[in-house]
Amino acid sequence: MSDFIPPAMDQMRKNYSLGGLHENDAKSDPLVQFQSWFEEALEDVPNWFEPNAMTLSTSDVSGDITSRIVLLKGVEEKKFLFYTNYDSTKGSQMRANPRVSLCLFWPHCQRQVRIQGTVDKVSREMSETYFHSRPRDSQLGAHVSQQSSVIDSREAMESSLAQLKARYPEGTQIPLPENWGGYAVTPMSFEFWQGRPSRLHDRLVYKRDDADSNDWVMQRLSP
């Protein structure tokens, strides 16, 4: 079988010319720099785009890597928060190896941020607060989904949803599932990427040696 190559894929490219990233303009604290870029990403954002969508990469003890899109749900106490099913593939991999990578790409700004760090579960109280702020259908969906497990059919899943709706009618509180909640990523490195002409992009990386340290070292990387 021949390789699948869509027409002209090798010629698909954009010229990046919206701006630059210089050390003199970058914040000394990468969290402040992230906040600045995130706020700019919210400006003139296309209505189809979720600027808090990020790629979460995890790995198991054998070194196999899995990546997927999750939603950033907050930055609190200098940690990046997201929520998911603890029994999912990512949940089991993070139990085995708490080192993770996050990547946010904002094409309308021609920018990307990579974050590497370690992950811990948030408190059940924090998970409950967020869970009950979600739309009711999303709360029910968290109960129905046995994430990453094989299921017989979509119909079986929808039947389970109907049963849960009958069990928890409007006006009753839906409990937080035991296997669902939040994670907090403590960053150890950031890389801020700004697209530039001629593929000579700007890349500034911040690193620290200790999770309790506020002493970040900034360096420029070759594109």
Swiss-Prot record:
Required cofactor(s): FMN
Positions in coiled-coil regions: none
Family annotation (SUPFAM superfamilies): FMN-binding split barrel
Keyword terms, alphabetized: Flavoprotein, FMN, Oxidoreductase, Pyridoxine biosynthesis
Enzyme's top EC category: oxidoreductase
Pfam families recorded: PNP_phzG_C (PF10590), PNPOx_N (PF01243)
Protein residues bound to FMN: 68-73, 83-84, 90, 112, 147-148, 193, 203
Domain of life: Bacteria
Oxidoreductase among keywords: yes
Keyword Protein biosynthesis: no
Cross-referenced InterPro entries: Pyridox_Oxase, Pyridox_Oxase_CS, Pyridox_Oxase_N, Pyridoxamine_oxidase_dimer_C, Split_barrel_FMN-bd
An MF annotation (GO) of this entry: FMN binding
Annotated substrate binding sites: 13-16, 73, 130, 134, 138, 199-201
Oligomer status and interactors: Homodimer.
Function of the molecule: Catalyzes the oxidation of either pyridoxine 5'-phosphate (PNP) or pyridoxamine 5'-phosphate (PMP) into pyridoxal 5'-phosphate (PLP).
Protein family per UniProt: Belongs to the pyridoxamine 5'-phosphate oxidase family.
NCBIfam families reported for this sequence: pdxH, PRK05679.1
Name used for this protein in its record: Pyridoxine/pyridoxamine 5'-phosphate oxidase
Organism: Rhodopirellula baltica (strain DSM 10527 / NCIMB 13988 / SH1)
